[in-house]
A protein has these predicted regions:
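Short aromatic-centered micro-motifs
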Residues: 75, 761, 789-791
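Extracytoplasmic gating/loop element in the C-terminal half of outer-membrane beta-barrel translocons
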Residues: 169, 173, 191, 317, ...
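Conserved small-residue
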Residues: 131-192, 291-292, 562-570, 678-779
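Flexible loop and strand-edge segments within Gram-negative outer membrane beta-barrel domains
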Residues: 141-144, 193-233, 237-241, 252-330, ...
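Glycine-rich, aromatic-lined ligand/substrate-binding cores of catalytic
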Residues: 364, 778-811
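Extracellular/periplasmic, surface-exposed regions of secreted and cell-surface proteins
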Residues: 24-27, 72, 264, 268-269, ...
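Short, small/polar-rich motifs associated with maturation and membrane association
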Residues: 1-261, 275, 656, 685
Length: 933
């Protein structure tokens, strides 16, 4: 598949990677199509940051990140822009990823970040074939931070107190005797267990395994008049949290249920006229805790001390931390139990009609297509049980371990809460429309195709006109218009030339800058088809092709960060603003006139980002197809990247926020290598596999940095979203070393032996915020690696797939102790006078550390290698009992996803985009079967 059509693989001169349904269906029980792409397409990087049911779709980038704004690729399903989440894996025939200028130029202002083409299955002429797929998945969490139990954490606190007594003699009151410590780990009875809690929050909240399941039925076939493919798919993602019975009339927790249906029909209306009709729909319901309290449910794994309180006491009272009552909200068990439930419902209906007419009677090889597509999507959030205003009315208790005194917190009022355990003190969440995800789309296009062969000369051409209209909620529609063409020439399958162009318009910009022309060219040379090479009779050489492409593509969109500049080219005015009272002496609230102020300064010169891409590559196959692969070297220059006014180098006396502008520039480069092998050892044995490596590095060249800013503080010459840190260079091992060191500009008096020595990078004689420097890598890996090995023996099939990344950094702030909670993590060895080569400094208790003493402690090497997929299956296809039962084949399989992980990270999350803590990432074990009738 290529943009707006198909080409023979041998004649393709663009950088295109492809995978098929067989590969996608063995990805270990995942229901997210995005997750199934991991490791299966060179150049494609997927990053998952949560295992929450329904939210496991990863962030996808192609050949790195070349913009600090959107890096999301364009996704087309059967030629229409649609979200990947709307497609079930069992309905996919193939996925193609277009990466270079030649492959993406026809998408104009939408193609700079790459394009993913998803083609769904279609019917073939013949009797009906029915496939039934069913699988059950057992899930468990992959990796969470290794937190100390109460005994170890409090023992560490004792050590810290000893180290800081000179600063805080009163901290001695927190020092615990060995007898007291023993009670946390070995309580004598229930009363002691509640007075000296030692809660393993992971064991308390999470099941050993959770269950998910998926079922799919599809039928395909056809006659000379009509071919059909129809599919129905149901997926359920279960909750890894334990089931909670709260006697309040609702069932809290997390889950995700999705139904997908699809019908693809191909009609041969006449010998020269075809009609293609695609109908698909999905209904998905995601269940979670209500509202903003959701993140507190999993914060236990990153922040709640094991000795703080019991999740729930024996009398049914929830635990809270009385010395600081605001921490009552951090009882994750309570947050899960009595915060209500909220349902997010997504409904989608997609339709597209394509009429194809062969015009061979006018000119051989000429045909025309007309397409009309209507999509509707609706999202409702908030429906369910709203208990968020009443959770604090539950009874709370805390037992002081020092005295054994019980403290309770009960909130009542005189209106209707006669009992603090009022089980009906919640209301029904009515739900509301999410306008950002509720939309309607209409696309229509006309396309003319030509392909013909004259002896050794093969020529092709394509011209396409498309209009798109897209509206969110009740907003004014977005509109685009595209005029696209492609011309191809192939001489004797030896020399190939291609030229693409797109003239695109977008109403996101002013009328003067609304249209632009993007184009690309590509050439190919099939060396193995040269007469001289054939004369050499190189039996080991099957195919060798060189190809190169160069061109420009655009990327429109006016969303920067969380702000949408829909009409960024226009001035925006609004009324109100009390600041005018200080200027005029008139209170606007008492004035008979409306006060207006300019809240946005427009920039009529706004335009799309422009990507200039170069790709030089080779494709090869040796030894009768046993070994094949490709190598690509690529470069990109991204210009005109949007910079919001708040980040521009504009003096404060400008008077208002500066307008958004196209001022950014980023360069990137890298390479891809893929090697595949496929060897039929005997009639029964086949060995196969593939390995791939992608390296992509980006560097900001221009970000409107202030000219007088120090070079290391500028964004220029750094990676996109570069990590920064104060750099440590060992420890203060004695007071003499500390007294002779560089002072800190804040809390300098709190430095002590055992602290990191922080590098005075700017050499100004003081550690300040200016010593925060670029360090490590960005959050996007520079290198991704994939290795897959498998074999087939008669009906048996087995494979394993490893996936890894490196040259990536991730910040995880796992702070131990700190004066309020006894949370402590296993980080290795702590500094002491007798252990001066420790892994990390000793934490603090009451003595506040100086501002910069963390150094690089919480900036982790984000590299990892994981056993991503593995499968063992057996297919029955020739057994007599199979035919007697009316079956064509039966495949039974066991597979898994995210099975093993090797990393220095404290948890299994590939990015922090979902927040500091998140629902645990899952490990899956899947058992299923596939029946073909």
């Amino acid at each position: 598949m290529v943009g707006f059509g198909q080409q023979k693989k041998a004649s393709v001169v663009g950088a295109i990677a492809q995978t098929n349904s067989k590969t996608l269906e063995r990805t270990g029980g995942v229901t997210s199509l995005g997750q199934a792409l991991t490791g299966n397409l060179p150049g494609v990087v997927t990053m998952t940051d949560t295992g929450k049911p329904g939210d496991e779709d990863p962030k996808i980038t192609i050949r790195g990140v070349t913009s600090w704004n959107s890096s999301d690729p364009l996704v087309l399903v059967d030629g229409v822009e649609r979200p990947m989440a709307s497609v079930d894996i069992n309905s996919v025939a193939s996925i193609s990823v277009l990466k270079d200028a030649s492959a993406t130029a026809v998408f104009g202002v939408r193609g700079a970040n790459g394009v993913i083409l998803i083609t769904t299955k279609r019917g073939e002429e013949g009797k009906a074939v029915i496939n039934v797929n069913a699988s059950t998945t057992l899930k468990t969490y992959s990796k969470l931070p290794d937190m100390m139990d109460a005994y170890d954490a409090l023992s560490l606190r004792n050590q810290v107190i000893e180290n800081e007594l000179a600063y805080h003699p009163d901290s001695w009151s927190y020092y615990l005797t060995q007898d007291r410590l023993h009670k946390y780990r070995h309580p004598a009875n229930q009363a002691e267990a509640e007075r000296y809690p030692n809660i393993n929050w992971v064991d308390y909240l999470l099941k050993d395994v959770a269950t998910s399941y998926n079922a799919n039925v599809n039928i395909s076939g056809g006659t000379k008049f009509v071919k059909y493919f129809a599919s129905a798919d149901f997926a359920h993602e279960g909750d890894i949290y334990k089931k909670v019975t709260n006697v309040k009339g609702y069932d809290p927790g997390f889950s995700y249920d999705r139904i997908n249906v699809r019908s693809n029909l191909d009609f041969n209306l006449t010998k020269t006229t075809k009609l293609h009709l695609n109908l698909s729909g999905s209904h998905a319901v995601k269940k979670a805790t209500q509202g903003q309290y959701e993140n507190l449910v999993w914060s236990a794994f990153y922040g709640i001390a094991p000795d703080s309180f019991m999740p729930v006491y024996s009398d049914g009272t929830f635990g809270y931390y009385q010395p600081n009552p605001t921490q009552a909200a951090t009882n994750s068990y309570e947050d899960l139990s009595v915060n209500g439930i909220g349902y997010t419902t997504d409904d989608r209906l997609n339709t597209d009609f394509t009429l194809e007419q062969d015009l061979g009677f006018l000119l051989k090889g000429l045909n025309v297509q007309a397409k009309l597509a209507f999509d509707n999507a609706f999202r409702e959030t908030g429906r369910g049980v709203d208990d968020t205003t009443d959770w604090e009315d539950e009874a709370h208790k805390w037992i002081d371990p020092e005295t054994g005194k019980e403290y309770t917190d009960i909130s009542t009022d005189a209106l209707y809460k006669f009992d603090f355990k009022n089980n009906n003190a919640w209301k029904t969440g009515a739900g509301s429309v999410n306008n950002g995800e509720t939309y309607r789309r209409m696309d229509y296009s006309v396309q003319l195709n030509y392909s013909n062969k004259f002896g050794d000369h093969t020529v092709g051409a394509m011209g396409n006109f498309t209009r798109e209209q897209y509206a969110k909620g009740s907003e004014q529609p977005f509109r685009r218009e595209n005029w696209v063409f492609r011309a191809t020439y192939d001489y004797a399958s030896r020399y190939m030339v291609e030229y693409n162009g797109a003239y695109n318009g977008s109403d996101l910009y002013s009328s003067e800058n609304r249209f632009a022309f993007f184009n690309s060219g590509a050439v190919g040379w099939m060396v193995s088809e040269e007469p001289l090479v054939k004369k050499l009779n190189l039996k080991w050489l099957d195919m060798l092709k060189f190809r190169a492409s160069y061109g420009q593509i655009g990327q429109d969109g006016l969303r920067v960060g969380n702000k949408d500049y829909r009409f960024g080219y226009m001035d925006v005015w609004s009324n109100g603003g009390n600041y005018r009272q200080s200027l005029t002496g008139v209170d606007p609230a008492k004035s008979p006139y409306k006060w207006w102020q300019q809240t946005q300064m427009g920039n009529p010169e706004l335009q799309w980002e422009v990507a200039t891409k170069l790709d030089i590559a080779a494709d090869f196959a040796f030894f009768g197809g046993v070994i094949s692969g490709s190598f690509d070297y690529f470069k990109e220059k991204r210009t005109d990247i949007l910079i919001p006014g708040t980040q521009r180098a504009i003096p404060s006396y400008f008077g208002t926020e500066a307008p958004i502008a196209n001022l950014g520039k980023v360069d990137s480069k890298g390479y891809e290598l893929e090697i595949r092998w496929n060897k039929q050892l005997t009639r029964s044995w086949r060995l196969w596999g593939n390995a791939s490596l992608t390296h992509a590095v980006s560097e900001i060249k221009e970000a409107d940095d202030p000219s007088l800013m120090s070079e290391y503080q500028k964004k220029a010459n750094k990676g996109v979203n570069q990590n920064y840190s104060y750099v440590d260079k060992g420890y203060y091992n004695s007071w003499d070393e500390l007294y002779g060191s560089t002072a800190h500009d804040e809390y300098d008096e709190n430095r002590k032996p055992g602290n990191y020595i922080i590098l005075d990078y700017d050499a100004d004689g003081m550690i300040t915020q200016d010593d925060n420097i670029p360090y490590g890598y960005t959050g996007i890996p520079q290198n991704t690696m994939n290795l897959q090995i498998g074999f087939d023996y008669k009906g048996w099939s087995c494979f394993v797939q490893f996936y890894g990344v490196n040259n990536v950094s991730r910040s995880v702030g796992l702070t131990s102790l700190g004066g309020t909670r006894n949370t402590a993590f296993f980080e290795g060895s702590y500094w002491s006078p007798d252990n001066q080569n420790a892994d990390v400094p000793l934490p603090r208790w009451l003595n506040q550390a100086s501002k910069y003493t963390d150094g690089t402690r919480f900036l982790f090497d984000g590299s990892y290698t994981r056993l991503k997929y593995a499968e063992l299956s057996y297919t029955f296809s020739k057994e007599k009992w199979l035919k007697a039962s009316g079956l064509s084949s039966l495949k039974v399989f066991v597979n898994g996803n995210n099975l093993f992980l090797w990393t220095d990270m404290p948890d299994d999350r590939e990015s922090n985009t979902g927040g500091w803590s998140a629902y645990p990432t899952q490990r899956r074990f899947n058992l299923g079967f596939k029946i073909t009738l």
